[in-house]
Amino acid sequence: NGDNFLNNQNLFFGAMEYYYDNGFTYIELGDGDELWENRKMCPIIETHSDAFWIMSKFYRANRMYMLYGNHDAVKSRPSFIKKHCNHYYCDSVRGCLPLFPGIQIHQSLILEDSEKRRLFLVHGHQGNLLNDQLWPLARFLVRYVWRPLELVGFLAPTGAGRPNKKKDRIERELAAFA
């Protein structure tokens, strides 16, 4: 079916319940929603309503931060957030429920502990021309070329197979970005 999250949905929900019950904060580091392969947010929320329900619990408890990545860069637009992230339709109550009303979705986040030590969080696509500046082109290629190939069984040619030189260059650029 092309849904890479479906097989892990129950594992995600169980982990999120544990983290919520034990006082953790949830930080989504981008690409939480595959918006290159999928044109709309609504079917994602409908399919994974349990995941969005528990994420909304974190949000209501002020224990959630969301960053956007290259695959969900449209979340950087306030108009997208207002239209797709404020509420969702819940079948069990046959009506709309709050999702993340008023959420701000950022490109990066700095955490600071009581000793003033800082940790810089970012999705990681920054510094890569295709995934950062040319993401609309990359989205087109994924949506209309890669996804159909994936549906017939081709494996992703990205990720860990990158040459070390390229990884080192991107790491230097991200350090400069920080």
Q: Can you name each region flagged by the protein language model?
A:
Residues 1-28, 32-178:
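Extended recognition/assembly regions associated with phosphoester-bond processing machinery
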